[in-house]
């Protein structure tokens, strides 16, 4: 399992949730889902519900099994292979293995599908079907979606099977920033807690819950990161750049503040790439070039002055880079670094032309 989810420790345990959420996010990216609900139930059981189309239940010719059964039992069966015709142009789930790996890492898993006016259910134990897919009732016309409920296997996750609310919240908040307008709700139903109200009084006991939805997308993300760190911004509006080719889409939001630190977060198909990669390289090279070229052409840098370095121009910068690609190439199974060479060119060209244009139009910045 470590090959697919990174570890069988705490990180891998939480990765199971992200894999199922990524499937729902793929429905959102395709335009079919706008609400994803994640619950931590008693005994650290996880439930993820989306209002997407619902995983198909029709029998597949090559296996003789319902599509949903195949998705949860066969590696690489997800609809994520082959761009245009796979059902998804871009997808964040781990190489299409997500659902079946989560199933294999669970003591039990139940999937409920609502589509075509009916609700279907199937349960699995340690990855194998525990009975066939059944129709368990009807739903109102137009009601669709998928609900996955699973209990991580304690024989596999020997360190811990206890979920941490804050860890899940951080990741799900990232997902909501990266997918503008998608609402993600996280609720902890393991125990009640007593909230402290604004006037200092205690409120009624309730489950801890966070609702995350950002119409501003990654611009809101940059604002959030600055406010969280109580930073003094040097220009009021976040700069937003977007570029697109037939290979993918790149979005960048950036803002400078009075600190000396650089904070750069990058994502490819909604997956954080902490080790950077070609999207970061393209951005950094172009940002430095823009500052030097603009500085020289406007007399801010004199002939005798040395060029500004990359470290100089990224001082006090908060930046979020998000690229969405049909075929993302990650280095290492845990996707820490992006390898697509064509994205370096896309990001580099976009940053240079659009940022140069921005500075010409906003010399005050």
Q: Where are each of the predicted segments found?
A:
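Conserved, non-catalytic sequence blocks in retroelement Pol enzymes and Pol-derived host proteins
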Residues: 7-10, 58-63, 279, 310
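GHKL-type ATPase core
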Residues: 44-67, 78-215
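Conserved ATP-binding N-box helix of the HATPase_c
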Residues: 10-35, 98-105
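Flexible hinge/switch segments at interdomain interfaces of large molecular machines
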Residues: 1, 41-42, 139-149, 254-268
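Active-site phosphate-binding and catalytic loops of NTP-dependent enzymes
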Residues: 3-8, 24-37, 78-91, 111-113, ...
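GHKL/Histidine-kinase-like ATPase module
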Residues: 132, 166, 174, 181, ...
